[in-house]
């Protein structure tokens, strides 16, 4: 299975990146091919809605999104891994998702989607802005929302290491079948 992991944290050893690391390790140990794109560390220009791409052509910006283009088109599973920033996904990951517009026709094919998110609060209510946004994304693209790992109560860098969430991410990666994700 080809997997594209899109991360949004600028902290190399941040909590959501820890989830991504464990997920990728589990997936690769199970024989899957995983490509990773750390949006916060790459140059992806925000979409300006110029419509030059026409939802299927090249984007006017020649930047690191070109790496994603081929990987997302060929991926069987896309994993979105983000910290919550002011009740939403990180701006850098959002910029990547907005640029999906330029390849809209090419990525509206059957795929699996996984969400892994971290946030400092412990209130379930605080999750809802990200979950509402995420719910619509795979639905619109015709993808299957396979599994979610929601990790509340982690704020300080590395605090997730004292929880069960890294193990859950690893086991999710290990449990991937050739057909897709299976619930944990």
Which positions does each model-derived feature cover?
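Cofactor-binding loop segments of dinucleotide-utilizing enzymes, especially the Rossmann-like FAD-
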Residues: 8, 39, 117-120, 151
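N-terminal beta1-alpha1-beta2 submodule of the flavodoxin-like/Rossmannoid cofactor-binding fold
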Residues: 1-82, 87-103, 163-184
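Short, solvent-exposed loop/turn segments at secondary-structure boundaries
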Residues: 125-128, 158-163
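A short small-residue
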Residues: 1-4, 114-115, 149-156
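Structural signal for conserved beta-strand scaffold positions within catalytic alpha/beta enzyme cores
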Residues: 36-38, 61, 115, 147-150
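Short histidine/acidic/glycine/proline-rich micro-motifs that form metal-
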Residues: 10-13, 85-87, 120-124, 154-157
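Short, glycine-/small-residue-rich phosphate/pyrophosphate-handling segment
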Residues: 91-92, 107-147
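A charged, well-structured terminal subsegment
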Residues: 134-152, 160, 170, 175-179
